[in-house]
Amino acid sequence: MSSDAALILEAANFAAEKHKQQRRKDPEKTPYINHPLGVARILSHEGGITDTAVLQAALLHDTVEDTNTTFEEIELHFGQDVRNIVEEVTDDKTLPKMERKRLQMEHAPHCSQKAKLVKLADKLYNLRDLKRCTPEGWSEQRVQEYFQWASEVVKGLRGTNSILEGKLDHMFMDQGIAV
């Protein structure tokens, strides 16, 4: 096994362990690990990304935000570069939800190229998931508001990966959102 493959599998295993008790909010209660795996797959299979640190960060992007993982732990196991990317894409859960959403829009243009890639793939995965199956308790209006907010975040990520941006644009247009 190549060392890059081993590093990516280590990140996948770490994320699976950290997210093992978590489920997505869809009616099927999909295992949460499907999300970071899907984000990494979008980057590699659709975005053409081969950068090991970006793929590791995609797998780990929700570990600090949604589990007891620390940034120090990410750095210890995966290095400074992966830690930096994960740190850039992690919301501060001590802040109210609307403030976190506002900060995502505000910070998007200032993220590193690597963090922007993870953010693009994360948004694409989440929007596809919303189209596939509405989370329990979500109205059509809430889905539309999420699409609108995501389109504002993506505006700040433009110029990062034309393939992923094009796929997002099609999703926004299908929802009647101008790009």
Curated annotation (Swiss-Prot):
Domain HD, residue spans: 32-127
Residues annotated for Mn(2+) binding in this entry: H35, H61, D62, D122
CDD domains in the record: HDc (cd00077)
The enzyme's E.C. designation: 3.1.7.2
Keywords linked to the UniProt accession: Hydrolase, Manganese, Metal-binding
PROSITE patterns named among the record's database cross-references: HD (PS51831)
Enzyme class: hydrolase
Domain of life: Eukaryota
Catalysed reactions listed for this entry: guanosine 3',5'-bis(diphosphate) + H2O = GDP + diphosphate + H(+)
Cofactor: Mn(2+)
An example Gene Ontology molecular-function term: metal ion binding
Similarity remark: Belongs to the MESH1 family.
Task of the protein: ppGpp hydrolyzing enzyme involved in starvation response.
Protein name according to UniProt: Guanosine-3',5'-bis(diphosphate) 3'-pyrophosphohydrolase MESH1
Organism: Xenopus tropicalis (Western clawed frog)
